[in-house]
Amino acid sequence: MKIKALSKLKPEEGIWLTEVEKPEMGHNDLLIRIKKTAICGTDVHIYNWDEWSQKTIPVPMVVGHEYVGEVVGIGQEVRGFEIGDRVSGEGHITCGHCRNCRGGRTHLCRNTTGVGVNRTGAFSEYLVIPAFNAFKIPAGISDDLASIFDPFGNAVHTALSFDLVGEDVLITGAGPIGIMAAAVAKHVGARHVVITDVNEYRLDLAKKMGVTRAVNVMNEKLEDVMSELGMTEGFDVGLEMSGNPSAFNSMLTNMNHGGKISLLGIPPSDMTVDWNQVIFKGLVIKGIYGREMFETWYKMASLIQSGLDLTPIITHHYKIDDFQAGFDMMRSGMSGKVILDWE
């Protein structure tokens, strides 16, 4: 049976709507009928066919990894799922036999493969994933929100790596993940949450999500904002979401002694860092990759159930046949999360 899918067909800029064979599930898998997908920054990299994509993405391949769907098939060894369950899923498929997997630190598996990156993705009418990777969506959480659990999980993992209660938090990079991390920080009790960027659209979006201050670093100095907020000792926690070298070095300059930094943004490999700031301030820096399996997922659901409102981050919806408009919107930088509807 042929089904619709968005695929990377050629080693050049673009993504194409095509027909592929419906995937077949194994004994430990679920077959999921996709309802909604969201476009990730990774998908934009794949669309643009940048240096990372050229080294990483096999062609041809169905792409996409942010989704919500309904279980329509269950492998014979699978327990705990029923036909009709609403699910999203962890996009990192882990090996199960390395030291970290066996030690319960699955998110640190050295043999990870990625849905829509190294194996068939979710931009399709149907997806097969290991049942281990599926996460049931509680009633009361909308399909829209469920479809962005993957990037929301990046935000939650980054933000909750350190204690935020009563702390002053600096977030560099107001993309959708940075903005969601800011919302999480406010929700769990941070004092001042300051986010920086140069994109006014995204900074306005951050204001709607409740940040203390959204700072365009082209127009304002971070030091002036700190003074305005009555901060005298620097930020306690930094969440680096941009991958921008000047943003990261500005963060180092403005951290308090003993401050803690989570790094999610991917900088150039040759980025220059003022290590004196790290050493003499006694800073702690933690690299973040993906989501903790599955502690982050349970936290995500609980945060929404406890009143965290992420709906402003979803700014655009398109039918799947209009996928090109969705990608154009994401590439413009004038959007939050963009959702593609498969129904």
Swiss-Prot record:
Binding-site residues, Zn(2+) 2: 95, 98, 101, 109
Chain positions recorded as Zn(2+) 1 binding sites: 40, 65-66
InterPro entries: ADH-like_C, ADH-like_N, ADH_Zn_CS, GroES-like_sf, L-Threonine_3-DHase, NAD(P)-bd_dom_sf, PKS_ER, Zn_alcohol_dh
Any one GO molecular function term: L-threonine 3-dehydrogenase activity
Residues forming the catalytic site: 42 (charge relay system), 45 (charge relay system)
Domain of life assignment: Bacteria
Reaction equation(s) it catalyzes: L-threonine + NAD(+) = (2S)-2-amino-3-oxobutanoate + NADH + H(+)
UniProt similarity note: Belongs to the zinc-containing alcohol dehydrogenase family.
Protein name per UniProt: L-threonine 3-dehydrogenase
Species for this entry: Aliivibrio fischeri (strain ATCC 700601 / ES114)
Lineage: Bacteria, Pseudomonadati, Pseudomonadota, Gammaproteobacteria, Vibrionales
